[in-house]
Amino acid sequence: MRRRRPWRVTLVPLAAACACAQSSSAAPPAVLSSPADPGTRAFAEALEPRLFEFPRDHGPHPAFRQEWWYITGNLHATDGQRFGFELTFFRVALVPAPDGRVGASPATTAGESASAWRTREIYVAHFAVTDVDRKRFRFQQKLAREALGLAGAQAAPLRVWLDGWSLEEPATGTTGPWRLHAAQPGYAIDLMLEPQSAPVLNGAAGLSRKSEQAGDATYYYSMPRLAVRGRLLRDGQPVELHGLAWLDREWGSGGLGPREVGWDWFALQLDDGSALMFYALRDKDGARDEHSAGTWVASDGSVRALSNADVSIAVTGSWRNRSGERYPAAWRIRVPALALDLSVRPALADQELRTTPPYWEGAVDVGGHRGGETLGGRGYVELVGYAEER
């Protein structure tokens, strides 16, 4: 879930900034645009459940205004050092592509020559590393237009890229393995991801509604267990790593409802092979919105949709950023129907991406029990809407 914003992207600053790939503090595109914007009317909308087809749906969906590929993971070195990472790619369309192709060039008027810089697509990517043992959190954002091959996405074989950052598969017609590349000052990753299970459809057969208004929805699936092996360069020194990652995929053209201002998203991988995803949408008055929802994946692979009423979340700790704004920083999550009772704590307090607006996305530790069985695990949490735009 993304990211994911008070679910709106400001396209004018994005368009002005995208002459080339660059580090940027433009608004994160993990924000969906408002359906009240007349410009969204020509885009397809997520209105009804659809038939998902893999591996095709790992690739882009140009009929929709925005989508993202969101990968997070917890990794360990052979000597026990721990790292977390986030690598995320966002595709935002400025206008619909008339022929349905991502990156199709805008039409030109009579007497006007097309420029190689013209584009219908903007891409933004975030790369963050949590170096738990050294208590470091580093992040970078890049932004580019699709023109001239600066950024883009394709389905066969899967490839999503921006500048030197990429998610790609080596063979056509498969679901993994996938390779991740990204680098920023002090840290770089080269990782292979191997799916351990089939994609999991969230919501109503993959349709995830964000409010009561038609079109305020996305098509949403997850791959909650990706085995990871590869290498991280830290200050130029290689560290061999292994662990688990999580892939989230969403696409749509709508937004949050008018009362919704942010959300808390949990993606938890438990040691018994099960997984829990839940997003808690927050209204202006601080209450949890009724469209909050999630998914439970049992260790045998069976899937259960979770409604807002199924899940109890209590905040048990907090953290303040450099501006004094408070984020929740510890939680107790209970799902009575599953006899599930979990505690969740950040691996590092400061995992805030100080983009515009800022958001917190970080590695967490999980403990608790299900019935009489003790459980542990790791995961990622995303917190949006707690800090002011700057």
Place the predicted regions along the sequence by residue.
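Structured soluble/peripheral alpha/beta segments that form catalytic or ligand/cofactor-binding pockets
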Residues: Q22-R390
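Hydrophobic helical h-region of N-terminal Sec-dependent signal peptides
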Residues: V12-A16
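Bacterial N-terminal signal peptides that target proteins for export
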Residues: R2-L11
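N-terminal Sec signal peptide cleavage junction
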Residues: C18-C20
